[in-house]
């Protein structure tokens, strides 16, 4: 029986389907023989280009409903369609580093084909319980404010919140750079439904700041996968999975991988467009009824296994600043940490502009990070919180009206604020200051001394844009010498 079934499948592969209906990104295909399974990739030609369709529904009477991964303009009824016999497969491996590809794994950076030893289907099962590693470990980023106050979990998920122009891209590039330096790990960046211009800028900035090499190859640290705003919903709904598949391959080879998604909201938005086109009845606020399932299936694949880890940083757009909107609310359920970038901090010239009071992490637990780290982090936060509550009094009455204790708190808080800044490797090109990667022990030691008053005698300026406390002390000596 099994042998008799084989020719049928070959017939399907050789193109036994025909287009019967095209409505936007949804294409119905009728097959004479065996129907392709759900999620299989079908191929047809459109205006001389390869058009990939993904099977979404079986409608009966040998018709399948598919989602197009590219524009369907120019597609006609009766056109022949071939079943590839497998889901969408994309190239994976070291050859993808430094390159940009689209949802179906085709290069879009005009640097020639991506030739890899193997390909991998974009739909994979999440690792089983046996494969998963449950040990709580911190991923040290070398960025003081992150490591001290909102540490990232290895294999965890981090939400990155911030408006336009507060330094999201620079922070992302620094994380890519530091993970490559400190852990020898690679990164994958999935541009989901964002501006093509920003994607292009990121690509060129990565080359300028030596994160990637032009045309890929030796020395490149990140693979880029784009499905931007101008693309059909099918591509935007699947491009995060394409990026995740490349990251999973690196993880299975024993790497600690960073996986960036910009923007996770667009993944949900594309899913809701596809859902409406497939004729599903919408759920709350017009989102797809399968919102939680779609999000869960993707997020559960991002995890630490016995082989390696995928740590995911996801930029999250909050529509109309409504945190109760189903799309961001569903994302929050999966997050281990949040990094909030604040415009008010960026306005002070403090970069990275991470808000030390708004950013949170479930890893900041004495059982995980240790008693000393936890105590120092909480003292830093309480000092900053006290300073924040005194700012109104300072604005109205001035510093002189404060008690001696409050004056000391304000002085320390201002030093802490400045010490939370640090020069980035990827910004060297623009600032001229060499970047600093700070070890966690040095970060804890420095801030412990600050909150305990060991450095009360040093001027504020000494703490601005330095790495470790030793550098701040050196800078203070220089400033004193210059003043003299």
Curated annotation (Swiss-Prot):
GO cellular component, one term: proton-transporting ATP synthase complex
Reactions listed under catalytic activity: ATP + H2O + 4 H(+)(in) = ADP + phosphate + 5 H(+)(out)
EC numbers on record: 7.1.2.2
Alphabetized GO MF terms: ATP binding; ATP hydrolysis activity; proton-transporting ATP synthase activity, rotational mechanism
Enzyme type, top EC level: translocase
Residues annotated to bind ATP: 162-169
Location in the cell: Cell inner membrane
Main location: membrane
Membrane topology: Peripheral membrane protein
General function of this protein: Produces ATP from ADP in the presence of a proton gradient across the membrane. The catalytic sites are hosted primarily by the beta subunits.
NCBIfam families in alphabetical order: atpD
UniProt protein name: ATP synthase subunit beta
Species for this entry: Agrobacterium fabrum (strain C58 / ATCC 33970) (Agrobacterium tumefaciens (strain C58))
High-level lineage: Bacteria, Pseudomonadati, Pseudomonadota, Alphaproteobacteria, Hyphomicrobiales
């Amino acid at each position: 029986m099994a042998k008799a079934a084989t020719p049928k499948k070959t017939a399907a592969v050789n193109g036994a389907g025909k287009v019967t209906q095209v409505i936007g990104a949804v294409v119905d295909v009728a097959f004479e023989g065996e129907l392709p399974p759900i999620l299989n990739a079908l191929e047809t030609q459109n205006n001389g280009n390869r058009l990939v369709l993904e099977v979404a529904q079986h409608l009966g009477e040998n018709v399948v409903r598919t989602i197009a991964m590219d524009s369907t303009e120019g597609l006609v009824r009766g056109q022949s369609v071939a079943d590839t016999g497998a889901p969408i497969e994309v190239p994976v491996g070291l050859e993808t580093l430094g390159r940009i590809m689209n949802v179906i794994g085709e290069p879009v950076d005009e640097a020639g084909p991506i030739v890899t030893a193997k390909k991998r289907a974009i739909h994979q099962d999440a690792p089983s319980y046996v494969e998963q590693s449950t040990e709580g470990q911190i991923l040290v980023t070398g960025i003081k404010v992150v490591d001290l106050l909102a540490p990232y979990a290895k294999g965890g998920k981090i939400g990155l919140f911030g408006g336009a122009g507060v330094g999201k891209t620079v922070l992302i590039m620094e994380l890519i750079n530091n993970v490559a330096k400190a852990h020898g790990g690679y990164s994958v960046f999935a541009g989901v439904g964002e501006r093509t211009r920003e994607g292009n800028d990121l690509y060129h900035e990565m080359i300028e700041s030596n994160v990637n090499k032009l045309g890929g190859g030796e020395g490149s640290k990140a693979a880029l996968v784009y499905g931007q705003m101008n693309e059909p919903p099918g591509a935007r709904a699947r491009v995060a999975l394409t990026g995740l598949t490349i990251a999973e391959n690196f993880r299975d080879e024993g790497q600690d991988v960073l996986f960036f998604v910009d923007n996770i909201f667009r993944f949900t938005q594309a899913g809701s467009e596809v859902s409406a086109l497939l004729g599903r009845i919408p759920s709350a606020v017009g989102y797809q009824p399968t919102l939680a399932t779609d999000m869960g299936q993707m997020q559960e694949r991002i995890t630490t296994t016995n082989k390696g880890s995928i740590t995911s940083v996801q930029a999250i757009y909050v529509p109309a600043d409504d945190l109760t909107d189903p799309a961001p609310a569903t994302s929050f359920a999966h997050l281990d940490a949040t990094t909030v970038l604040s415009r008010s901090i960026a306005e002070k010239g403090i970069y990275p502009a991470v808000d030390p009071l708004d950013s949170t992490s479930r890893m900041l637990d004495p059982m995980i990070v240790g008693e000393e780290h936890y105590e120092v982090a909480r003292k830093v936060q309480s000092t900053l919180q006290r300073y924040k509550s005194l700012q109104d009094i300072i604005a109205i009455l001035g510093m002189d009206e404060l008690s001696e204790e409050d004056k000391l708190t304000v002085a320390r808080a201002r030093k802490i604020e400045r010490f939370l800044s640090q020069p980035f490797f990827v910004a060297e090109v623009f600032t001229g200051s060499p970047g600093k990667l700070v070890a966690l022990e040095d970060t804890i030691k420095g801030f412990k001394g600050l909150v305990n008053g060991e450095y009360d005698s040093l001027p504020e300026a000494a703490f601005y844009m330095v790495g470790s406390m030793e550098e701040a002390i050196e800078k203070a000596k220089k400033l004193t010498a210059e003043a003299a």
